Amino acid sequence: MDQKRLTHLRQLETESIHIIREVAAEFANPVMLYSIGKDSSVMLHLARKAFYPGTLPFPLLHVDTGWKFREMYAFRDRTANAYGCELLVHKNPEGVAMGINPFVHGSAKHTDIMKTEGLKQALNKYGFDAAFGGARRDEEKSRAKERIYSFRDRFHRWDPKNQRPELWRNYNGQINKGESIRVFPLSNWTEQDIWQYIWLENIDIVPLYLAAERPVLERDGMLMMVDDDRIDLQPGEVIKKRMVRFRTLGCWPLTGAVESHAQTLPEIIEEMLVSTTSERQGRMIDRDQAGSMELKKRQGYF
């Protein structure tokens, strides 16, 4: 890795650690949202650096839908145990009682009830006033205009027209009773930065990011990996083994794989350098207006 790239990554690292420390010092009850993906892995790594040799002064929170890949659940538990992190897992009990699932109820309703409402329930239950998230500005247009300190009202709603200026790395964390913030320490990172940093720091990631032969079928213009027996095959659908990997991870029925032979980090980085498609092209929840990212964030999404 050339010196210019290395210096750039260290600048990003320094900024992120500064943000994490600022929030830990400024807020009474912060939490780190842990979605198990590559960005969460980098954010957790930075947080551990920020407070080394001590332990994290806040817990991890996973809002579970019940539909993550099995490898993600195994990785989550292994990581929390290895690092001695306090891990809170919340699943919307009302959604569970209603039997909400992406196949029957669709991506928009599933995401709203199991993720957005589940997140708000967890934040209210534990009284968190600041929640770290791994979103980056290069991922999606609504995230591109969101501040590092993203203020939410007492209903956890985001108003993009009412954001505070962030000048010279000075962040205004003053909130009223009942309000909270979402904090995005990776805002200025790109997908390429994330992969370069994972390689540089030897950060452990879910194996689904690396290409392997996996059982997939084609549905709604995406390659769906069949992760368990809850799927109902539609007429004409055939499950085949193909060399695929994932650029982004979520609920397995809503996350499309990409055909790839990149089985190492350098191969992923090389693949990203020539990619002309969006990182979130395989996320079903981003495809319709009802499920648009900005609308979901206005309603309290991550």
Curated annotation (Swiss-Prot):
* CDD domains, A to Z: Sulfate_adenylyltransferase_2
Establish whether keyword Zinc is in the entry.
no
**What's the catalysed reaction?**
sulfate + ATP + H(+) = adenosine 5'-phosphosulfate + diphosphate
Q: Which GO terms describe its molecular function?
A: ATP binding; sulfate adenylyltransferase (ATP) activity
For the keyword Transferase, the answer is yes
Classification via InterPro entries: PAPS_reduct_dom, Rossmann-like_a/b/a_fold, SO4_adenylTrfase_ssu, Sulfate_adenylyltrnsfr_sub2
What does the record give as EC number? Answer: 2.7.7.4
Which cysteine-cysteine pairs are annotated as disulfide bonds in the entry? none
Keyword list (alphabetical) reads:
ATP-binding, Nucleotide-binding, Nucleotidyltransferase, Transferase
What GO biological process, any one, is recorded here? hydrogen sulfide biosynthetic process
Pfam families, sorted: PAPS_reduct (PF01507)
Pathway(s) this gene product operates in, as recorded in its UniProt entry: Sulfur metabolism; hydrogen sulfide biosynthesis; sulfite from sulfate: step 1/3
- Top-level taxon of origin: Bacteria
Q: How does it assemble?
A: Heterodimer composed of CysD, the smaller subunit, and CysN.
**Which family does the UniProt entry place this protein in?**
Belongs to the PAPS reductase family. CysD subfamily.
Function in brief: With CysN forms the ATP sulfurylase (ATPS) that catalyzes the adenylation of sulfate producing adenosine 5'-phosphosulfate (APS) and diphosphate, the first enzymatic step in sulfur assimilation pathway. APS synthesis involves the formation of a high-energy phosphoric-sulfuric acid anhydride bond driven by GTP hydrolysis by CysN coupled to ATP hydrolysis by CysD.
Q: What is this protein called?
A: Sulfate adenylyltransferase subunit 2
Give the species. Salmonella paratyphi A (strain AKU_12601)
Gene responsible for this protein: cysD
